[in-house]
């Protein structure tokens, strides 16, 4: 089992390491230790390190917003490598811009517009970030549909 697990991790890592470096560098642009996060295998586990600070797990270095950016970079890397556009070409992310600084939010919005994903469903409770996403997506020629879930819920509750 341990050998199979290590082989799986190695295959996954080799497949996503370049997209992860690119996407994390684009999303976490204000990171003082350099652009991009490197993934390596240590003692049978996947570890993420800053490119310029070898041996340091980024979970001990990055802020919450930067870790959110890394999570999205990992998601996009896996989708880029293993995603099948012949199937359901959709991306769903709950509050992707939460705790992310403005520069990273703009970078993420730009990156999402360049992915060619059939449908992107995002949720956020921050109006300013929703406005940013709406602007970036419309500017990229993508159609945008917004739903205020609280208003929809209140409408159904008051109608009963």
Where would I find each of the regions flagged by the language model?
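C-terminal lobe/lid and adjacent interdomain/linker elements of RecA-like ASCE P-loop ATPase modules
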Residues: 104-160
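Charged, surface-exposed helical/loop "interaction arms" that form contiguous linear patches used
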Residues: 1-28, 32
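Short beta-strand
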Residues: 29, 36-41
């Amino acid at each position: 089992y341990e050998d199979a697990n290590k082989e799986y991790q190695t295959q996954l890592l080799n497949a996503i390491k370049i997209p992860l470096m690119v996407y994390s560098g684009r999303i976490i642009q204000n990171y003082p230790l350099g652009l991009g996060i490197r993934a390596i295998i240590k003692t049978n586990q996947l570890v993420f390190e800053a490119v310029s600070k070898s041996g340091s797990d980024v979970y001990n270095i990055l802020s919450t917003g930067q870790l959110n950016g890394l999570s999205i970079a990992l998601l996009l890397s896996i989708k880029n490598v293993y995603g099948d556009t012949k199937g359901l070409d959709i991306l769903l992310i709950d509050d992707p811009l939460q705790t992310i600084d403005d520069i990273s939010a703009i970078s993420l919005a730009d990156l999402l517009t360049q992915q060619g994903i059939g449908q992107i469903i995002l949720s956020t409770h921050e109006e300013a970030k929703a406005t940013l996403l709406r602007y970036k997506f419309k500017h990229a020629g993508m159609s945008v549909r917004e739903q205020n879930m609280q208003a929809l819920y209140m409408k159904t509750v008051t109608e009963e």
